[in-house]
């Protein structure tokens, strides 16, 4: 157990990131505009890493559309971060095909590495101040309900 704690401490020291920190973003949207994490500091963000070839990612799109519709007026931003999915034009076709109603950013391998993503989908719930609240890897039957609960908790705590 002591060895595990030491390894974790060394990892945090080596990466310079605390467990609740989230890497900064500066990535293009599909329309070419750049979205920066500084613009999101007062929002609650649901950031989903996905890929066009990931069937589990596709299965989550309807839930993210619902979250966007339900919470966007309350300061919540749903963002799909497309990685390993080809050119922006390929992603744009996919977005239209699957009727994605939330912001889509085009990421790259550096983004995947910065966030420590090793599988898809990978979803982060980020609170105000760009602080990590919770991270979900993969899919589960309760993921959408869990994210809703996270959002509600963060909304109640928001000044």
Please give the residue ranges for each predicted region.
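Thiol-based oxidoreductase modules, predominantly thioredoxin-like and allied folds used
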Residues: 75-88, 100-109
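Thiol-/selenol-based redox modules, centered on thioredoxin-like
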Residues: 125-159
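Conserved redox-active cysteine motifs that mediate thiol-disulfide chemistry
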Residues: 49-66
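Hydrophobic beta-strand anchors of alpha/beta hydrolase catalytic cores
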Residues: 46-47, 78, 123
């Amino acid at each position: 157990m002591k060895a595990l704690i030491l390894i974790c401490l060394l990892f945090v020291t080596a990466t310079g990131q605390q467990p609740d920190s989230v890497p900064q973003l500066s990535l293009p949207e599909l329309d070419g505009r750049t979205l920066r994490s500084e613009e999101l500091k007062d929002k609650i963000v649901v950031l989903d890493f996905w890929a066009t070839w990931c069937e589990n990612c596709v299965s989550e799109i309807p839930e993210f559309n619902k979250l966007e519709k339900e919470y966007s007026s309350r300061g919540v931003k749903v963002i799909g971060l497309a990685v390993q999915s080809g050119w922006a034009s390929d992603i744009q076709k996919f977005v239209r095909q699957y009727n994605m109603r939330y912001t889509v950013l085009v990421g790259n391998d550096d983004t995947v590495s910065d966030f420590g993503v090793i599988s898809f989908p990978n979803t982060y719930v980020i609170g105000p101040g760009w602080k990590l609240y919770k991270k979900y890897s993969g899919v589960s039957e309760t993921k959408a309900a869990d994210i809703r609960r996270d959002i509600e908790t963060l909304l109640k705590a928001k000044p």
